[in-house]
Curated annotation (Swiss-Prot):
Lineage: Bacteria, Thermotogati, Thermotogota, Thermotogae, Thermotogales
Kinase found in the keyword field: no
Recorded GO CC terms: plasma membrane
Location(s), subcellular: Cell membrane
Mode of membrane association: Multi-pass membrane protein
Source species of the chain: Thermotoga maritima (strain ATCC 43589 / DSM 3109 / JCM 10099 / NBRC 100826 / MSB8)
Protein name stated in the entry: Uncharacterized protein TM_1467.1
Amino acid sequence: MMIDVFLIALLLSILTGNIKNVLKYNYKGLYLFAIPFVLQLLPWKEILVPLSFVMLFLFFIWNRNIPGFKLMAIGAVLNGFTMSVNGGKMPVWEPTLKLLNLDLDFKHTAFTEFSWKTLLADYIPVYLPWGRKFVISVGDILVFIGVFIFFVLKPRFQTQPSRVPHES
């Protein structure tokens, strides 16, 4: 679903002309954005998944002045914590999987009873108009909102004139 959200937000930013604003930011630690996704594909998930989320969190925190990144950081922390306490996999509520007729992939594990370890798991069903179905978490929702804020909202750069009247 992240790809869908990213592409929709990117398309909206192109259509609204806000894409030029996305390119103006001075990103810190940009390498920390790509590496975590590679780490999650490797074995040793109990170690590498938490490490990957720490790297993402650092990237978002170092760039917290960029609109949307704080929400993405919070969502990443929630998802990273949930995956970390569940052996490096995101738990998905089995009844929702059955409802949507979905199979698990290598990054997910099914659960049937809620506990403190599954409180922030994937249990929210999502149907997209083009036929794709997903189960998402509260952390995912925060990340998605952050992505839309980042791509779609017009940022306020420091080079803009101040709105505070000057005293004479």
